[in-house]
Swiss-Prot record:
<dbReference type="GO" id="GO:0051438">
    <property type="term" value="P:regulation of ubiquitin-protein transferase activity"/>
</dbReference>
<dbReference type="Pfam" id="PF00023">
    <property type="entry name" value="Ank"/>
</dbReference>
<comment type="similarity">
    <text>Belongs to the fem-1 family.</text>
</comment>
<comment type="function">
    <text>Substrate-recognition component of a Cul2-RING (CRL2) E3 ubiquitin-protein ligase complex of the DesCEND (destruction via C-end degrons) pathway, which recognizes a C-degron located at the extreme C terminus of target proteins, leading to their ubiquitination and degradation. The C-degron recognized by the DesCEND pathway is usually a motif of less than ten residues and can be present in full-length proteins, truncated proteins or proteolytically cleaved forms.</text>
</comment>
<dbReference type="InterPro" id="IPR002110">
    <property type="entry name" value="Ankyrin_rpt"/>
</dbReference>
<keyword id="KW-0802">TPR repeat</keyword>
<dbReference type="GO" id="GO:0060090">
    <property type="term" value="F:molecular adaptor activity"/>
</dbReference>
<dbReference type="GO" id="GO:0043161">
    <property type="term" value="P:proteasome-mediated ubiquitin-dependent protein catabolic process"/>
</dbReference>
<dbReference type="GO" id="GO:0016567">
    <property type="term" value="P:protein ubiquitination"/>
</dbReference>
<feature type="repeat" description="TPR 2">
    <location>
        <begin position="390"/>
        <end position="423"/>
    </location>
</feature>
<dbReference type="GO" id="GO:0050728">
    <property type="term" value="P:negative regulation of inflammatory response"/>
</dbReference>
<dbReference type="GO" id="GO:0000151">
    <property type="term" value="C:ubiquitin ligase complex"/>
</dbReference>
<keyword id="KW-0496">Mitochondrion</keyword>
<protein>
    <recommendedName>
        <fullName>Protein fem-1 homolog A</fullName>
    </recommendedName>
</protein>
<keyword id="KW-0677">Repeat</keyword>
<feature type="repeat" description="TPR 1">
    <location>
        <begin position="298"/>
        <end position="332"/>
    </location>
</feature>
<feature type="repeat" description="ANK 3">
    <location>
        <begin position="82"/>
        <end position="111"/>
    </location>
</feature>
Length: 669
């Protein structure tokens, strides 16, 4: 263990005497080096603050000159926080004495992490009320600094269910209707977490029922997450609304004075909210803050029922909520009709939404139809662009796959993938997950068929080819973006999945016309000139063993001679270069694949091409490999190649004296 690591470990473990022994008598330069970042990215001061070692913190700052602002990496709840200052770490862990000490020694109260999280947000996240009070009350920490997602301290307090912190922030003037980058408010966070008491608190401070970027109100957010208590509270009939036929109160639309809707109408520092939800501001009832229309209540109950089907797996509970929704639709003799679907969907087995009480009651004998109803309801209310819509379609497909109904699974997954590609940005994580699921499913089914023979489930060319075509389309869409996707891990993964689908296509029978279609699609991919990590082309990736690791479950095995041949047949350049000037031949040599090397050479790859380190592919072959002795590089070297290497070796100037295509040939060597 080196001295730097020993200092870090002593600070982490709170061993002050050992730390003093290691650091005493050191020069300023040595102290700066020893109290700086270690290999993991943290500093001794940061880790001491993280674990609350006050004496170590003060020693490092006062005696060793450690910077109270130096950020680093620190671990919390299984996550690595980058660029965290010591004050952030102490606040997140709730060490009030360390927080006081660091602030007395000049730490900035609003200094943020790499994701723009402040010490105040860190304290709010884990519910450290005393730290929050100290940061705000004694040092005027900014309540409104949001993280990179636009999520504020009030929002995270609501989401985590820290009622007293939320109350305190509101008393200090936190903006109750502030919106995040995705348009959600603190009310949405309460609804998603099921924090009814905090939701009542916010409504008492004039929180508005806004729609977020997906068109979701807090009421719908509660339905999606299955928080029945929030839904029941928000849809209860409101006093003072107009009466409908039959003498029952009908919930009406919100009537709110805009002048009082921008948070708590109190000066900063004045008490904003009452001491309990039963004592609202200005004598107003909480109910008057959140009247809900009949249509909104119906949709909330229908969506809640869908959540009971798919998330809670409670079909009887779902029926109960759907019955209430149906009663509301027919309330007072004025029927609220459902919109007619533009067309029936094969993936849903051509199901229609029920429209009468009789149709609804008939569902109790058909659980599968109930599950289709849940998918139909969710798509109607949330729309195709909401992540939950496609997520639960895929979830239902996975359930079918688990029971061996792969055909039904594939239909649902294809429908979800079409929905994602039509509504989400290219290479969104959800779309990438869909492609990977397809590859893993196809691999499993093809292995199952091989094991069971004709009894296995049939996966045909059309299934694989359909997904491959969509994968190539996704790459084309990504390359049309204004930013360059080549360095994106998601883009590399998309290319790898396409190669795995090509690998699997070898295992299904193809007619000549289908083979032609496959080659056309691969040609489209190559024409895009996509590049993955380190500038890898698809041909580089096909000869690299790391391409095998694409998900949790095995799909194809790489390097793959079959995939290499398909790519070469479709026009892949065997002399293409990555960022280190490696050709696919170099990568094949690094992976000890002489058979693939021979295929590349036969396709015109230059055996004597050198990479950025002036190594040929032959020189990269494992010396212990038997095939190295059988490969004769000079059998593939032309006189032209030797001349090019001689020019390079002797540093003979050639640029401007020969044609440009010859210049490129010399640079290859």
């Amino acid at each position: 263990m080196d001295l730097r690591t020993a200092v870090y470990n002593a600070a982490r473990d709170g061993k002050l005497q050992l730390l003093q022994k290691l650091l005493s008598g050191r020069s300023r330069e040595e102290l700066d080096e020893l109290t700086g970042e270690v290999a993991g990215g943290g500093t001794p001061l940061l880790i001491a603050a993280r674990y609350g070692h006050l004496d170590v913190v003060e020693y490092l700052v006062d005696r060793c000159g450690a910077s109270v602002e130096a950020g680093g990496s620190v671990h919390f709840d299984g996550e690595t926080i980058e660029g965290a200052p010591p004050l952030w770490a102490a606040s997140a862990a709730g060490h009030l004495d360390v927080v006081r000490s660091l602030l007395r020694r000049g730490a900035s109260v609003n200094r943020t992490t790499r994701t723009n999280s402040t010490p105040l947000r860190a304290a709010c996240f884990d519910g450290h009320l005393e730290v929050v009070r100290y940061l705000v009350g004694e040092h005027q920490a900014d309540l409104e600094v949001a993280n990179r997602h636009g999520h504020t301290c009030l929002m995270i307090s609501c989401y985590k269910g820290h009622r007293e912190i939320a109350r305190y922030l509101l008393e200090q003037g936190a903006q109750v209707n502030r919106r995040s980058a995705k348009g959600n408010t603190a009310l949405h966070d309460c609804a998603e977490s099921g924090s009814l008491e905090i939701l009542q608190l916010l409504l008492g401070c004039k929180a508005r029922m806004e729609r977020d970027g997906y068109g979701m109100t807090p009421l719908l957010a509660a339905s999606v997450t299955g928080h029945t208590n929030i839904v029941e509270y928000l849809i209860q009939e409101q006093p003072g609304q107009e009466q409908v036929a039959g003498g029952e109160a009908q919930p009406g639309l919100p009537q709110e004075d805009p002048s009082t809707s921008q948070g708590c109408a109190q000066p900063q520092g004045a008490p904003c909210c009452s001491s309990s939800p039963e004592e609202p501001l200005n004598g107003e009832s909480y109910e008057s803050c959140c009247p809900t229309s009949r249509e909104a209540a119906v949709e909330a109950l229908e969506l809640l029922g869908a959540t009971y089907v798919d998330k809670k797996r409670d079909l009887l509970g779902a029926l109960k909520h759907w019955r209430r929704a149906m009663e509301l639709r027919h309330q007072g003799g004025e029927y609220l009709p459902k919109p007619e679907p533009p067309q029936l969907v094969l993936a849903y087995d051509y199901s229609r939404e029920v429209n009468t009480t009789e149709e609804l009651e008939a569902l109790i004998t058909d659980p599968d139809e109930m599950r289709m109803q849940a998918l139909l309801i969710r798509e109607r209310i949330l729309g195709p662009s909401h992540p939950d819509t496609s997520y639960y379609i895929r979830y239902r497909g996975a359930v079918y796959a688990d029971s061996g109904n792969f055909e039904r699974c594939i239909r649902l997954w294809k429908y979800a993938l079409d929905m994602q590609q039509s509504n989400l940005e290219p290479l969104s994580p959800m779309t990438a997950s869909s492609f990977l699921s397809f590859a893993e499913l196809f691999s499993y089914v093809l292995q199952d068929r091989a094991a069971k023979g004709s009894l296995g489930t049939q996966i045909g060319f059309a299934d694989l080819m359909g997904v491959l075509t969509k994968g190539v389309r996704e790459v084309e869409r990504a390359l049309q973006l204004p930013r360059e996707p080549g360095d994106s891990a998601q883009f590399t993964k998309a290319l790898a999945i396409i190669l795995h689908l090509l690998y699997l296509l070898e295992k299904v029978e193809c007619t000549p016309s289908q083979e032609h279609l496959k080659h056309q699609t691969v040609y489209r991919l190559l024409k895009c000139a996509p590049r993955g990590k380190n500038g890898f082309t698809p041909l580089h990736m096909a000869v690299d063993k790391d391409t095998t690791n694409v998900g949790r479950y095995p799909v194809g095995r790489f390097p793959s001679l079959h995939v290499v041949k398909v790519l070469l047949d479709c026009g892949a350049d065997p002399d293409s270069r990555d960022f280190d000037n490696n050709t696919p031949l170099h990568i094949a040599a690094q992976n000890n694949c002489p058979a693939i090397m021979n295929a590349l050479i036969e396709a015109g790859a230059h055996m004597d091409a050198t990479n950025a380190f002036k190594k040929t592919a032959y020189e990269l072959l494992d010396e212990k490999l038997l095939a190295r002795g059988t490969m004769q590089p000079f059998n593939y070297v032309t006189l032209q190649c030797l001349a090019a290497r001689a020019l390079d070796k002797n540093k003979i100037p050639y640029k401007g004296f020969i044609p440009e295509d010859l210049e490129a040939f010399i640079e290859l060597h």
